[in-house]
Amino acid sequence: MKLENMLNNKIKDLKPSGIRRFFDMASEYKDIVSLGVGEPDFDTPWHIRQEAIKALQEGRTFYTANAGLKELREEVCVFTEGRHGVKYDPMHECVITVGGSEAVDISMRVLLNPGDEVIICDPGYVSYVPAVTMADGTPVILPLKEENQFRITPEDLEAVITPKTKAILMNFPNNPTGAVMGREDLEAVCEVLKRHDIIVVSDELYGELTYTGKPHVSVVEIDGMRDRTILIGGFSKAFAMTGWRLGYALAPAPIMEQMYKIHQFAIMSAPTLSQYAGVDALRNSEEDIVEMRESYNQRRRYLVKRFKDLGIPCFEPFGAFYIFPNISQFGLSSEEFAMRLVEEERLAVVPGTAFGDSGEGFLRISYAYSIEDLKTALDRIEHFITKLRNEK
């Protein structure tokens, strides 16, 4: 028996994550400085850890309700209403998931029938196309352009809509570009979506990390969008809780009823200790969020200025903790540039093409690292591009 003949062809055809493939190669080198991982360099705040320790000591280690702790679902809904002014029923419109990635996955499986099309922004997070494909949907790529600050425009959106379009999977603040969508931008795009009766799956995991001086605007705040949107959030980025694997989804009850089924059969419930920690995170972390956001903003400003001084075009990101410089002037592909950085400078960043074809000519650099690491990394980039310019 050939085991490869026993496997699902659709899964076999999926390509591994471009990020993981690149870092597997980079890991072969010693003394690497990495700006590649999208993970906060802060420890989970102590008061959050204490709540999990307390739950463990008290023996609260059993399954929760499939949809999640009632207390946590209530806090998610309170948090969302406080941030966006939109109400959800914690008993029928909220599910606690194993990270935001599970929420994306079950959203696609709930919505899609074979042949349904889902619009996906490119560059975009690496799991979106596989999530659509595994749910028997058809990914349709919406290129995001540097001249539009990597935002969706109504014109570009109209160009990719077909009679088969079922949904759009949006991610703002955006990974990998750091782009944000303001209220006017969203209103214009949502008019197109409403006119074509398209569902929105909005991954807003980085919603607490914006640097415009104004709060993040959610899709669900736009008139008429609350009841055609699955809103996805989580704890990994804003609360420095990546390893706790905790996220959530909010959606109208008819959609959520079906999401509960998949979550129940595939997961049972999110990790119990993580859920108790999540309750404390939502109640008591405002100062922690502000502190981390201010630190990221300092690093963001440093990188923007440094790239400008180096003569490398770099649109200014106002969200998440990534910067997306344009290195096309050097005549190397994104992957060639990134690989030579590893080989010659012992610096690991992510080639833009890991996030789709529209990432060609760009690099994704995470500033979820210390300012000292960022300075070291930019010194190495400066040394490298000086060599490239001298080669010409």
Where are these regions (language model features)?
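PLP-dependent class I/II
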Residues: 2-7, 12-14, 22-29, 33, ...
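Phosphate/diphosphate ligand-binding glycine-rich loop within oxidoreductases
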Residues: 53-57, 61-66
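Conserved N-terminal alpha-helix of the aminotransferase class I/II PLP-enzyme fold
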Residues: 63-98
